[in-house]
Regions:
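Charged, amphipathic alpha-helical segments and their flanking helix caps
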Residues: 1-18, 35-106
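Transition segment at domain starts
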Residues: 24-25
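A short, hydrophobic beta-strand-centered structural micro-motif
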Residues: 28-33
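Acidic carboxylate-rich catalytic motifs and surrounding loops in phosphoryl-/glycosyl-chemistry enzymes
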Residues: 21
């Protein structure tokens, strides 16, 4: 799996989704995927296996658990264990839910 595969899977759920940021803000709800850092497996003083730490960010003007459940079910289906963090962005007047996970070899 690559981050592009994930973006396509999220789009198939009906959410606008892109890497990084949109050129113009889409209608809500929408998602972005971002690379956070690498956590490669290292052996014999070299990077043995690529392990990328990514974030899937979901934005909506209301707290809407059915959308979150769709995303969580898809991440589980794709076997991407995740941690979830939620906040309200006052300046944007949006809820933000961040799913953090690793993509190995992608």
């Amino acid at each position: 799996m690559t981050y592009m595969d994930l973006i396509n899977e999220i789009k198939a759920l009906g959410f606008p989704c892109t890497y990084g940021s949109f050129k113009s803000t889409p209608s809500i709800p929408f998602c972005t995927v971002n690379f956070a850092y690498n956590n490669d497996m290292i052996a014999d003083n070299q990077n043995y296996q690529d392990v990328g730490q990514y974030q899937l960010e979901y934005y909506n003007s209301i707290k809407y658990p059915p959308d979150e459940q769709k995303i969580e079910s898809k991440l589980k289906e794709l076997r991407l264990p995740y941690a979830k963090v939620e906040t309200f962005l006052d300046s944007e007047d949006l809820y933000q839910v961040i799913y953090e996970f690793q993509i190995i070899g992608g």
